[in-house]
Amino acid sequence: MSGLTADLDAVAAAGGYDDTDAMVEEAVRELLRRRPELRLSLAVEKYQSGAVSLNRAAELAGVSVEAFKDELADRGIDRDAGFLTDAQRDDHLQTFME
């Protein structure tokens, strides 16, 4: 067990946490509360990876959808409009008809 792991286990036990995961979750929540720029960056990363929708990312960032769109534009991140190409649409339709 590494020194860091042992320290985390000790802090979790001393703090009354069920396990280190619970303690780390609380620590991350507190970090994001204190540093809103990290919260925004996390939301951008989750949006870019496809883990969350635009609306959910804005909610996570604590900003309006329009403000989040502006942030994406400021960072040079293109948004997928969600439109299908003709080929994708035909493929979906064919699958649906089967």
From Swiss-Prot:
* Pfam family for this entry, one: UPF0175
PANTHER family for the chain: UPF0175 PROTEIN SSL1255
The Swiss-Prot or TrEMBL record describes its family as follows: Belongs to the UPF0175 family.
| Protein name per Swiss-Prot or TrEMBL | UPF0175 protein VNG_0066H
